[in-house]
């Protein structure tokens, strides 16, 4: 009887208001702590409240948090849209979309000055015995929810790497107030590429293809890594046409979609190959009408979603525009971009300068840029590595104040003549830190997109790049071993973290020296 009473008391003792300067890794406890908020324990779990006015992605993230709490403690947390009364509820909401949070803000019980109006920021604190996760925007709230999931012991890689969850009888959130500011790199994401036969075969067997069932897991992984951007698989796939639910799911969950460097106007290359006879030759100089019509359909289809539109034009597929000198191709490219922006303005009903766009300075396109080709100031310049993990240029000083900013397209997977580098991780963490730090320090900080091939076996470099993109200042050159140990501890075993980190470090180092697939 005494034991049962103690168990009930432990999970009804909510923490007293307080503010600490830092929450850190120890903000979740696995044993009772006076003044702490009890998430779950001994057959009980706090309800998670999401307002009906909030984003669907917030509700989906809350459902996952409830499931994660169940994985850790054995007791799943329910999600409710009913307005919470009393104490003991996790209230997750976006400023302006959660009645209870907005009410407490007006009453001065929550100070949101540190996150209000900021990009992807969140705070966590208690109010009147409830745990509040308040986001500045949709992804701010979602990141706050998944941040708590990670802290209770659920790895972002729980699905794609089968990372087990360590069980605990109770979960507590320590007293204090935690504020997470905006990321240093605005858009952070991956490109699923060179995906056949490995990822494509698995996705077809497991889900029936690259459909919304498959992408739900990919989007969740990205959000758990605090990433927000993606180029979808495209070798034999059309993201919007293979499953019409794909685009809506991405927008609901909070993922900004784009298309690769040779797929303009939100049209996967497969869209064109299926319509080659209808559209006509992929030659703007001779088939402007057919290609413009193709572009219009892409703009109309994606206009209701959060997207970054790739503009420009290369050849039919991942090749250079053919049939002329650089100067002649540059003249055609100028007409292409002018036409694309006219289409965007017409379809969206506003100045194209207000529509996020990027121009990829990739392979032969960099020659055009070096020869003086310019795009409007509001268009992001996406610089690229040399396909082997070395950036080709740091941010040019003359571009550092451009309105559209600068981004980086980087390969940790490569498929192209004369060599492939696809199925073995050959990228070391120190090299990644060096190259991305060069980009960041030179002002290339608006978007980082990484070609990750089949996703597996590139878990480690993906994890590092996404975390580094959030705050490059947090991992210094002499701290990469610390990161590796932390990664090993989270995804394998604390008892063996040092040994695992050493093995993984040497494995990638030896592979970098020889590039086994290239031999």
Which role does the model predict for each range below?
Residues 23-182:
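Contiguous, structured surface segment used for ligand recognition
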Residues 79-81, 166-172, 234-235, 241-252, ...:
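Gly/Pro-rich turn-and-neighbor structural signature
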Residues 95-97, 123, 127-165, 241-267, ...:
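Hydrophobic or amphipathic alpha-helical targeting/insertion segments
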